[in-house]
Structure formats: C-alpha cells, structure tokens
C-alpha cells in the first residue's frame, strides 16, 4: 500500500537545492499563472520547492492557499512523477482563478513529468 504523506524528504529545504534547480533546470513548463522548473536528482523520489513571491501575491492568505493546493496535488501524484527536484513559481494571474481551475491546471502541468 502506498503512503501519500508529504514528508520532509520530499521538500527542497536549503538554498543550494533551489539554486541547482534554477540554474540547471532541464524541463520547464509554463502557463500564464504558474511555472514549474524541474531538474533530475539521484534520490529515487521527487522533491518539491515553492516560490510564491510576495511581490506577485500580496496577501498571505492567498499565498498560503496556493501553497496548499500545490502541495496537495504533488502529494497525490508523488508516485507517478519522475525522480526530479521541482520548483513551482506562482505568477500574478493565478489570483483570477478559482481553486478547481488551479487544481486542474496543476494536474495538467504535473502530467508532463509522469514516469
């Protein structure tokens, strides 16, 4: 039975990991609302980092909502994804979408990284 927890080992925790993804991203998928950068790792499981700039999304409750939605879609799809480090970057236009549209868009973006 698969366990769908979002453990600490599935997170990008330090700045060097983020910089490695920003500088050496192999796969980039963009929409007007979100970008996902990906870089292969040797860990055998995917890891997620979030970049939700305060400059783009002013209110903390909106930033937290976006983070929750991204983490939830990642958590549910973690066993389908390639062994990569991902950084998700939110853009201003994401505020104009409702939750179901954001989830659908994230699922379609994650599908580009399936095994």
Swiss-Prot record:
Keywords: Endonuclease, Hydrolase, Nuclease, RNA-binding, tRNA processing. It comes from the Bacteria. InterPro entries: Ribosomal_Su5_D2-typ_SF, Ribsml_uS5_D2-typ_fold_subgr, RNase_P, RNase_P_CS. GO terms for biological process: tRNA 5'-leader removal. GO terms for cellular component: ribonuclease P complex. It catalyses: Endonucleolytic cleavage of RNA, removing 5'-extranucleotides from tRNA precursor. Its EC number is 3.1.26.5. The keyword RNA-binding applies. Belongs to the RnpA family. HAMAP family: RNase_P. RNaseP catalyzes the removal of the 5'-leader sequence from pre-tRNA to produce the mature 5'-terminus. It can also cleave other RNA substrates such as 4.5S RNA. The protein component plays an auxiliary but essential role in vivo by binding to the 5'-leader sequence and broadening the substrate specificity of the ribozyme. This is Ribonuclease P protein component. PANTHER family: RIBONUCLEASE P PROTEIN COMPONENT (PTHR33992:SF1). PROSITE patterns: RIBONUCLEASE_P. Pfam families: Ribonuclease_P. Consists of a catalytic RNA component (M1 or rnpB) and a protein subunit. The lineage of its organism: Bacteria, Pseudomonadati, Pseudomonadota, Gammaproteobacteria, Enterobacterales. GO terms for molecular function: 3'-tRNA processing endoribonuclease activity; ribonuclease P activity; tRNA binding.
């Amino acid at each position: 039975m698969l366990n769908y927890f979002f453990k600490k080992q599935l997170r990008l925790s330090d700045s060097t990991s983020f910089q490695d993804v920003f500088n050496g991203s192999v796969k980039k998928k963009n929409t007007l609302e979100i970008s996902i950068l990906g870089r292969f790792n040797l860990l055998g499981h995917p890891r997620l980092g979030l970049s939700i700039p305060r400059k783009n999304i002013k209110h903390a409750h909106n930033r937290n909502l976006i983070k929750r939605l991204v983490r939830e879609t990642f958590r549910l799809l973690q066993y389908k994804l390639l062994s990569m480090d991902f950084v998700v970057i939110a853009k201003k236009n994401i505020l104009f979408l409702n939750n179901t549209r954001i989830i659908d868009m994230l699922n379609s973006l994650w599908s580009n990284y399936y095994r």
